Amino acid sequence: MEPWSRWKTKRWIWDLTISTLALTFLFQAREVRGAAPVDILKALDFHNSPVGISKTTGFCTNRKNSKDPDVAYRVTEEAQISAPTKQLFPGGIFPQDFSILFTIKPKKGTQAFLLSLYNEHGIQQLGVEVGRSPVFLFEDHTGKPTPENYPLFSTVNIADGKWHRVAISVEKKTVTMIVDCKKKITKPLDRSERSIVDTNGIMVFGTRILETDVFQGDIQQFLITGDPKAAYDYCDHYSPDCDLTSKAAQAQEPHIDEYAPEDIIEYDYEYGETDYKEAESVTEMPTFTEETVAQTEANIVDDFQDYNYGTMEPYQTETPRRVSGSNEPNPVEEGFTEEYLTGEDYDVQRNTSEDILYGNKGVDGRDSDLLVDGDLGEYDFYEYKEYEERTTTSPNEEFGPGVPAETDFTETSINGHGAYGEKGQKGEPAVVEPGMLVEGPPGPAGPAGLMGPPGLQGPSGLPGDPGDRGPPGRPGLPGADGLPGPPGTMLMLPFRYGGDGSKGPTISAQEAQAQAILQQARIALRGPPGPMGLTGRPGPVGGPGSAGAKGESGDPGPQGPRGVQGPPGPTGKPGKRGRPGADGGRGMPGESGSKGDRGFDGLPGLPGDKGHRGERGPQGPPGLPGDDGMRGEDGEIGPRGLPGEAGPRGLLGPRGTPGPPGQPGIGGIDGPQGPKGNMGPQGEPGPPGQQGNPGPQGLPGPQGPIGPPGEKGPQGKPGLAGLPGADGPPGHPGKEGQSGEKGALGPPGPQGPIGYPGPRGVKGADGVRGLKGSKGEKGEDGFPGFKGDMGLKGDRGEVGQVGPRGEDGPEGPKGRAGPTGDPGPSGQAGEKGKLGVPGLPGYPGRQGPKGSTGFPGFPGANGEKGARGIAGKPGPRGQRGPTGPRGSRGARGPTGKPGPKGTSGGDGPPGPPGERGPQGPQGPVGFPGPKGPPGPAGKDGLPGHPGQRGETGFQGKTGPPGPGGVVGPQGPTGETGPIGERGHPGPPGPPGEQGLPGAAGKEGAKGDPGPQGISGKDGPAGIRGFPGERGLPGAQGAPGLKGGEGPQGPQGPVGSPGERGSAGTAGPIGLPGRPGPQGPPGPAGEKGAPGEKGPQGPAGRDGVQGPVGLPGPAGPAGSPGEDGDKGEIGEPGQKGSKGDKGENGPPGPPGLQGPVGAPGIAGGDGEPGPRGQQGMFGQKGDEGARGFPGLPGPIGLQGLPGPPGEKGENGDVGPMGPPGPPGPRGPQGPNGADGPQGPPGSIGSVGVVGDKGEPGEAGNPGPPGEAGSGGLKGERGEKGEAGPPGAAGPAGIKGPPGDDGPKGNPGPVGFPGDPGPPGEPGPAGQDGVGGDKGEDGDPGQPGPPGPSGEAGPPGPPGKRGPPGASGSEGRQGEKGAKGEAGAEGPPGKTGPVGPQGPSGKPGPEGLRGIPGPVGEQGLPGAAGQDGPPGPLGPPGLPGLKGDPGSKGEKGHPGLIGLIGPPGEQGEKGDRGLPGTQGSPGAKGDGGIPGPAGPIGPPGPPGLPGPAGPKGNKGSSGPTGQKGDSGMPGPPGPPGPPGEVIQPLPILSPKKTRRHTESIQGDAGDNILDYSDGMEEIFGSLNSLKQDIEHMKFPMGTQTNPARTCKDLQLSHPDFPDGEYWIDPNQGCSGDSFKVYCNFTAGGETCIYPDKKSEGVRISSWPKEKPGSWYSEFKRGKLLSYLDVEGNSINMVQMTFLKLLTASARQNFTYNCHQSAAWYDVLSGSYDKALRFLGSNDEEMSYENNPHIKALYDGCASRKGYEKTVIEINTPKIDQVPIIDVMINDFGDQNQKFGFEVGPACFLG
């Protein structure tokens, strides 16, 4: 059983779809009461002690200002009390948010409903169940919340035999229960937004209808108030604490969870432990120690004169005020009377009514109905509709004790019951003909029907045992007025029958109860039974029921007969011509364009005033890890390091003598991961594992193979009618079937939509002449026909009426051009032009400050080797040096003795997963594991392969006609079909529409007369034939006398067809009949024998194309086509605007169509809709009376081009039109001839600072670097093959200096090495033991060079040595040949700006510049000579509006016009972003050299020129002075060959096995130490590379800021939203500032208002005037903005940020109380809308700025507390951020406002 099944079974037997509570009381302050509370006990007359109610002592035995204890009422199970809901709520409105307040002491351990509220259909809408687990029952009209979601307060037990004050607050979607002013529990209430509780029903106290559990206990107070906050003040204002000075009142602490869960289950709740998991927000409310109530001397109001409230002092009313402490007296609410306070005794003079004693004589269980006197006055009885869902009952739910009716009514008992009416006869079965069974859609729910007649009385059951005497019943509802009869009309309303009597066998309790409530049998009272009264008036139509669950598809019903075609409606009057609408508001801005190329940098603005320092912003999210910092300075020498790692293996020593056997060693460290072993044998299947967690949802599997065709499924129900499918491809022609038997005539199909006119068919063969048709109805006038052949001149006819206005003719040929118009007025000044071309280079600036230290230069040439220095003192022990490279493998040592067996080592760490092994053999089947939990629903798989074609299904039932489809385009002309056999003549159709007139045929030759036939009897009128063509004019008949109009005779019977008569003489021309619509196709007739060929008939005229026939019945469904190929991926759609937040969940199925509502009031004029498609021509209406001349109609749409008219005569020359609008800009004309040389221009102004350019090409070689420090003198040796790094040997003794070798060739530039400056040299590590040879590793990174080794034996002659030291200067050599170009050097540093060079030659003609800004309007020029006469101008502007003409007749609808001519040129758009840089144009031809310009100012010094050629040898100079001692002499002769040196890392080839082997024996290679200089160089290069990387892709840090958040997003798309540093002007990063980057919104850069500008609290602002700016308020100021760090933003940076921005937005939230912010509903205008001041001092409002929108406008209604959120989203960047706001709607007594300013966000 579901945990909520109690609600399903214990709800009423009707399907309870509960209406919801509606009427909102918004933001009511605690002190402000809503409507007066409803006192339930007073309304139910408790003070008169009805049956089952008695007075008792209440909650307090002692109360201040009262001698007597509180009065309460004891309720026993005999009490049966109810009342109409309207009696409690006379206004008929139940509040949407409310409080239910009661002070009760239920009987211990009970659980029953204290209150049940039903609507007029008997559906329970509201209920409060109290006891061991209180429940709040509420269901709205949509069935929400569902029974399983009813709020259950399972942790509270108020049925513990003690008094409790309980308050329930229902506000919006929560319900809060406060017990004894301390325990507060809030639960969700999932109801609708607008819910209404029906007050037309009944309220039952203490139980539910048909429920056996009754509330038993004491109740002192029971209130319902429309203020949801009243529940929180219950103990203050409604039920104050007792007087604690005397004996304390009963304990009222509720028992919490004092019963076991089993108790609940026994009580039939069956709430599982996990059913209510929502967190209950339990709040302990403060306990007030003492509360006093102020006194008053006011007299008790007259309403309560029938009873007083004890002798306590009347209460004094005070103005409410806030209670600031628990000891202050709590005020009584204003206007709050004693009526709602507790503690008073109702001392009432009871109007005692007749007590009716119920005896047991002659009263059985069926006859003990309580009868209510019908003379109680008019009162509507609200019918409870019967539902038949309840099938089982428990004995407890049967009839209990008898019920009294409402108070004061006289009651009696009688043994009478009304007779039941007889059952009607069974209706005739429906006749459903084949083809008529068409399923219609379900109709809307009909209104409630009238009450049926009473049914027959069933046979009496066995009498039950007499029950105990029941108490007097409660008063029933007043009955409706019946027609007056001799006895009074009675209303039977039983509630329970005799007490414990057993049930009679006749009818069930539910049936009897429902009969008693619904039948309203009228039984005579007093005296013998009188005649049955007349049936009462039918009750009012019930409100629409809530939508039921969707039923199953019904069987298709029969198709109804086709209705008669209604007459055409009268032509409506033409509507008045509407006033021209006001100009529409400015359109919304278009979508942001794609980001343009960066514009030229503007001039830097003046520095702004320093802003206030902002307060510290909120803690930002943790930043990204920063970049590695710069290397710090060397620290002090550290303490002695730990022993270093073992050094490389030493040389092999002599073999030692074996030592004594050692102790067993300690277990060794785990060895390295061994190689993967071979595949082991197949293991035994393991035991079944534990249930695993459900795995994550797998990816969709691959496409499975096509499955076999499944078995044929069972016959399904006919489905709903599908929408018309798309036209399938034409099927293959089938075999010709046998001629079937003639079927029965089917019903006419529904009218199909009128199709497009088909193409003209091929002329058919002559048909057999049809029977003469009866005279058709008079047809309507046809359209004007084409011009026929000249007929015989007729008699002069009477003057006809003026014909309707013809259709507009085709547009005539264009007239000749008119004369040139007068010059137009001068136009307005144009908008600001685009950005100009960059200016000339500026003058050189002042000398800048000294630059930072540059990167170290390249090392100079090797210096001469210095003399050997004195050995230094041993330095302190350095830090441990880096591990040297691995030594080469030493020779294999002798095999040692096997050591003792070590202890077993510990388990090694888990090795890395091995490579996938080969597929093992198939293992045995394992044990089945336990069933896993169901996995999540898989995603939709890929579409499967098309399955095999299934068998042809059964012929489905004919579906209902689908909705009319859209008229398709005209299909291609089909092939001419064979001439069909003639069908049976159809019945006469209704008169058809007037056809188009056919062309007049030429007169044919007269045919031969046929043979004379025998005159037959006059046959009946034949079936009407198709309308004949217009006959030839008949001979003039003799005029007859005018006869009187005779009555219409009855239609005669149909006679048998007569024989064919002879051809008569031609009759007069008949009026053309209206062609009837095409009838349904008749059944195929049997093929007749071919007749004799008749004589050649006259050539008929071309027939008029008939109207399109009705569509035939749908053919059988074709077999489904093969799946088509997948279409190509469509073009991506335009980017949509940001959508609103979607609602949860997919949309539900469409509900049933509701009943038609009452017609609404006429709506306002809507905006003109888009032009619809051309409709079909409707049927022509009857000729109406001629109307008055109308106003001229609006200009019709341009028609389709008609056939070309005959050429008209030349018209008169028209007057000259006014000048036309300027035409669109023409195409670029050809370049004109070169103009004369212009005068020299003035010196241009200083140009704006240009963009930082892309890195330039490599510059010229820089100046030579400073001489490097002297290098070590190199050994001269032959260059050996490059070997791998050798093992580091012990430091050798330094060899003797080698001779200098000749200068070597320059080497190539090396690759960058590892970054980082070299560390301090560490001390030599201790030699370690060599390891075993490992497998060849991958080539490692180039290591640093090893230390110098000892000198080896002399090698073979070396190759050319490295460069030697510089020798002394030799004699001047001869000029050498030009060397080959060296390798391109690295880019040098930027040199200083040289002096300005001489003017260069004129360069080639540059690209066409960007148009300059529009200049100011010049003075008018001198008048030119008269030009030649211009061509005829375009048509002039329209003239003034003429006087209204007379109203023309309604014209025919025009055809769809051609596309109109292009409109006038629109206003010039806003300035676009700079376009992308065009590709460079081809070099232009050289221009004519201009005249020499004025001598310009001296230019800046030029760059140093390239070195000149070496000069010739100069003449001998004078003998100089003796020089200083010279440099070392030239190199000596070659020395002995040197050792092979370790190649530098940048030059070493890849290691190969051969190289390794070739140097294995060279243990002591001497490696030159080049590492220091190289690492520094490569470190610098690497840091340069990183700097460039950071320039290209900034990180958004303080030292590496981005330009805007958009740039940062483009550089790092994966960065999260957060705070980053930006530097819009891209200068020094010292003025960067921190902003919030909203990457989610596309890379917005956001700044925030300072603390004082963030907003103001809501207040009434009594000293301020509406319509003033906030900065003019006493507490106001201009709004200012800060960065995220709280610092003011540099004005220049702000300007640059705006330059880089395409649009900006900012939100402004206005908090209000009865104050409008934007739209004012009361006035229906925006007169009181806020106004904003932009940062460009521009005022923005609703009237002048279309970029301001209200995202949410809650203040428009000016009710209660609300807010309005306004968004300014503008492309005019200077308007944002706003700096001031004007408030216009405040100053009244209840009006308040406050606001919050949001961040300003800029999007680049």
Swiss-Prot record:
InterPro entries noted in UniProt: Collagen, Collagen_superfamily, ConA-like_dom_sf, Fib_collagen_C, Laminin_G, TSPN-like_N
Any one Pfam family match given in the protein's UniProt record, by short name: COLFI
Residues annotated as glycosylated: N1638
Region annotation Triple-helical region (interrupted): where it falls in the sequence: 418-506
CDD domains attached to this UniProt entry: LamG
Region of interest: Telopeptide: 510-527
Proregion span(s): 35-511, 1562-1804
Binding site for Ca(2+): D1623, N1625, Q1626, C1628, D1631
Biased composition (Basic and acidic residues): 805-814
Residue numbers carrying Allysine: K610, K1450
Keyword list, A-Z: Calcium, Collagen, Disease variant, Disulfide bond, Extracellular matrix, Glycoprotein, Hydroxylation, Metal-binding, Repeat, Secreted, Signal
Signal sequence extent: 1-34
Localization annotation: Secreted, Extracellular space, Extracellular matrix
Domain Collagen-like: 440-488, 527-584, 567-623, 728-781, 1427-1482, 1481-1539
Laminin G-like domain span: 70-242
Biased composition (Pro residues): 697-708, 1074-1083, 1216-1227, 1341-1360, 1428-1437, 1491-1507, 1528-1537
Protein name, UniProt field: Collagen alpha-1(XI) chain
